[in-house]
């Protein structure tokens, strides 16, 4: 194994690689706030979501009809000065899922190109484009729903470039025994960003109007881009500020997995590799439920618990405190179990995958039965994202174990499977809750639990953690 190089390990939390993890944390924070901004703003943009009884109304109803039924709510959070749109739940589902269409379009090519041209430029450019499009979202909404869908799709393409490039960087910066820790610090930015945007988004909408949600977090993204291009380098060998000790530690730790000169990607071997399909099915299942929670949580709390936009945002943010905490703690625990040789690598991956798929499924199944209990509902909603993020130390980073040389490319494919699940679940959720709010939400959560169980069984059956034969060095590759 690769434990020996760690004997001359450089200091961890004062090291450049942990600084890189923090900057990537901020980048993930920025991208998720830009993605989730619409989920909280739409409560004010489409005042129908404030009134659960209006889910079945036709989109042809005149706007005056909507104002008559929600005049007090509009005055309450001061959206009378900004536009209110007639978007049905089905239309909202399409808008929510459109960003996933864009991400899918760029995940695989950007993962491949990041390995050629460098992840720094790929990720930075994606973050910049996403930030600029966020700033223009309020303007495009006035020109119609089609343009909003187009903008969100292009924004998804930009974020797909940014998401995928991260694993190219970690393949060169993360020592094997620190992978869970470093990637969990970086990945927790998404959970923390969800917490912040959902917590303050409603307050911003109430105080300044919903367009300022996009203006503020789009501007933060532009600042993050400046930091990214200034500090980040593709690998430790070329960073001007890294210490010799840390550079030697990283290089020696990765020596057994270093890439030989780049060749064509062994697509046929990948397609026939069941451990890879186990990872893909894990992503599909995980993203199905996570997309529903991230996208529809404010709407669920608003329509089922009957709270206003400010309280809906604050309540929606609470689950992501648990998510960020579980991501970091899960990474620490996984690396502890590995460094002390308490469990084998595959056992750790399957343990955290099991916890991350089974526990949120149980909570989701229980939700429809406790809808009358405000406190119990909130507790379960907090537990779903928290326990789900334990997967970050399971199959989420499993590509770094089975094929580190192709980690970025395979991460693109993995996220592609996850985003296909997100598109289906977002659209299906919009359709189900438009038919009947009560039974619709019950069917949404039951279906999500079933998908999670399928992914868990598949991963437990076929998941592995050894480097696959087609991903090894030249002497072991096919003729």
From Swiss-Prot:
For the keyword Transmembrane helix, the answer is yes
Record-level GO cellular component terms: apical plasma membrane
> Could you tell me which SUPFAM superfamilies the record lists for this protein?
MFS general substrate transporter (SSF103473)
Q: Which organism is it from?
A: Bos taurus (Bovine)
> What protein does this entry describe?
Sodium-dependent phosphate transport protein 3
In the UniProt record, what gene is named as encoding this protein? SLC17A2
Q: Indicate the family of this protein.
A: Belongs to the major facilitator superfamily. Sodium/anion cotransporter family.
Entry-linked CDD domains? MFS_SLC17
Per the record, the major location class is: membrane
The opening ranks of the lineage are:
Eukaryota, Metazoa, Chordata, Craniata, Vertebrata
Catalysed reactions listed for this entry: 3 Na(+)(out) + phosphate(out) = 3 Na(+)(in) + phosphate(in); urate(out) + n chloride(in) = urate(in) + n chloride(out)
């Amino acid at each position: 194994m690769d434990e020996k190089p760690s004997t001359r390990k450089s200091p961890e939390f004062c090291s450049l690689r942990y600084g890189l993890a923090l900057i990537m944390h901020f980048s993930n924070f920025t991208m998720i706030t830009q993605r989730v901004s619409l989920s909280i703003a739409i409560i004010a943009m489409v005042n129908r979501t404030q009134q659960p009884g209006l889910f079945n109304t036709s989109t042809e109803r005149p706007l005056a009809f909507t104002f008559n039924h929600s005049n007090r709510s509009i005055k309450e959070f001061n959206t009378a000065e900004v536009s209110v749109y007639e978007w049905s739940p089905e239309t909202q589902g399409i808008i929510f899922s459109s960003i996933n269409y864009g991400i899918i379009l760029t995940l695989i090519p950007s993962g491949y190109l990041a390995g050629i041209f460098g992840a720094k430029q790929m990720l930075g450019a994606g973050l910049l484009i996403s930030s600029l499009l966020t700033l223009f979202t309020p303007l495009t909404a006035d020109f119609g729903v089609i343009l909003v869908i187009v903008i969100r799709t292009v924004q998804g393409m930009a974020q797909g470039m940014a998401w995928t490039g991260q694993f190219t960087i970690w393949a060169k910066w993360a020592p094997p025994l620190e992978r869970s820790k470093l990637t969990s610090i970086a990945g927790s930015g998404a959970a923390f960003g969800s917490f912040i945007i959902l917590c303050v988004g409603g307050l911003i909408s109430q105080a300044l109007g919903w367009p300022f949600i996009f203006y503020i977090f789009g501007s933060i993204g532009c600042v993050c881009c400046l930091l990214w291009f200034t500090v980040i380098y593709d690998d430790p060998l070329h960073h001007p500020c890294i210490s010799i000790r840390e550079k030697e530690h990283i290089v020696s730790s990765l020596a057994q997995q270093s890439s030989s000169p780049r060749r064509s990607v062994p697509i046929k071997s990948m397609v026939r590799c069941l451990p890879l399909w186990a990872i893909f099915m894990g992503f599909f299942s995980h993203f199905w439920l996570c997309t529903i929670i991230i996208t529809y949580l404010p709407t669920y709390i608003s329509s089922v618990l009957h709270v206003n936009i400010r309280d809906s945002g604050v309540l929606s943010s609470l689950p992501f405190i648990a998510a960020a905490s579980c991501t970091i703690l899960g990474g620490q625990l996984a690396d502890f179990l590995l460094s002390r040789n308490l469990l084998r690598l595959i056992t750790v991956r399957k343990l955290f995958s099991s916890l991350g798929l089974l526990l949120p499924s149980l909570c989701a199944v229980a939700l429809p039965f406790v809808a009358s209990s405000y406190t119990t509902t909130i507790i379960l909603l907090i537990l779903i994202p928290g326990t789900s993020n334990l997967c970050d130390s399971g199959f989420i980073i499993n590509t770094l174990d089975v094929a580190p040389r192709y980690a970025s490319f395979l991460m693109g494919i993995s996220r592609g499977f996850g985003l296909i699940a997100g598109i289906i679940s977002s659209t299906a959720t919009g359709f189900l809750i438009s038919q009947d709010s009560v039974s619709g939400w019950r069917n949404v959560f039951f279906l999500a639990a079933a998908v999670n169980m399928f992914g868990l069984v598949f991963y437990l059956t076929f998941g592995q953690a050894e480097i696959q034969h087609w991903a090894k060095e030249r002497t072991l590759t096919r003729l």
